[in-house]
Regions:
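Non-catalytic structural scaffold of enzyme domains
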Residues: 1-266
């Protein structure tokens, strides 16, 4: 039986989902969050759909064993690859992430938006469906951005090599006249200051973190699973990679010291 005081489970290929964790912590602070970073296999963007599906099911099974009341997939690639399988297999709520095409279409004034996306998302049926539903009246420039996640997984948010990559990915979008850029990975939210600097003040950056936090709050409320107001949510972190290194990176990205446990089975 699910109880309102149970934690919310989250997972991602690595640390990108922490950007969503921050939004959840801000929007619904009473909720406890158990987070799994599959850092040993990051990034998922170059993995097969079968791998992402199976890995999502494995991690969700672990989180179920920890007594979670809901699952948040803190990854665009993870959502594309495993959300359907998780919703079919689990009885608890599953909240996924999709690129913020709809709000970007609403925000653009030039009628041209850009989307920085992982390679796996760029060609996905899910993105194509979003473009069909919301992007028919605007021009959408899809820009796959391989190589960024590795920098973020190392807590490198402004190094010279990273800056060159970001400039190379963003410049064609600016030349095409975009005034709105979708951050199509939870990882890329940590690069918001750098991307904003490269894109300039006239370009709006949009991500899905706040919307995911709102959706989670809505789903928990509908199921009468919301943590009691006034309670203080806690956090636990696991990684399939090196716990010491993950603790360093997660602490740097969250701006506070955390401890990380080794995910059983890796």
């Amino acid at each position: 039986m699910l109880v309102s005081g149970a934690p919310v489970g989250m997972f991602d290929s690595g640390v990108g989902g922490l950007s969503v964790l921050r939004e959840i912590r801000s929007a619904i602070p009473p909720e406890s969050i158990y987070y799994v970073a599959d850092s040993a296999n990051a990034p998922w963007g170059d993995k097969s759909p079968d791998f992402v599906r199976d890995r999502g099911l494995e991690i969700a099974t672990f989180l179920l064993g920890q007594g979670v009341k809901a699952i948040v997939i803190g990854s665009n690639t993870g959502t594309a690859g495993s959300a359907a399988a998780l919703r079919s297999a689990l009885t608890i709520p599953v909240v996924g992430i999709e690129p913020a095409i709809k709000p970007a279409v609403a925000a653009t004034k030039s009628g041209v938006i850009g989307a920085l996306v992982p390679v796996a998302v760029g060609g996905s049926d899910r993105l194509a469906s979003l473009l069909d539903r919301f992007g028919s009246d605007v021009k959408v420039m899809i820009q796959p951005v391989p190589g960024l996640v590795e920098h973020i997984e190392a807590a490198d948010l402004d190094g010279p090599e990273l800056r060159r990559k970001v400039e190379g990915y963003v410049r064609p979008l600016l030349e095409a006249g975009v005034d709105t850029i979708v951050l199509g990975s939870t990882h890329y939210v940590f690069l918001r200051p750098l991307i904003s600097e490269v894109a300039g003040p006239r370009v709006t950056l949009i991500d899905t973190g706040p919307a995911v936090a709102r959706q989670l709050a809505k789903v928990l409320g509908e199921r009468e699973l919301s943590a009691a107001n006034g309670s203080s949510g806690t956090e636990r972190f696991w990684t399939s990679g090196d716990p010491e290194n993950s603790a360093r990176v997660i602490s740097a990205l969250l701006g506070r010291k955390v401890s990380v446990e080794k995910l059983p089975g890796g």
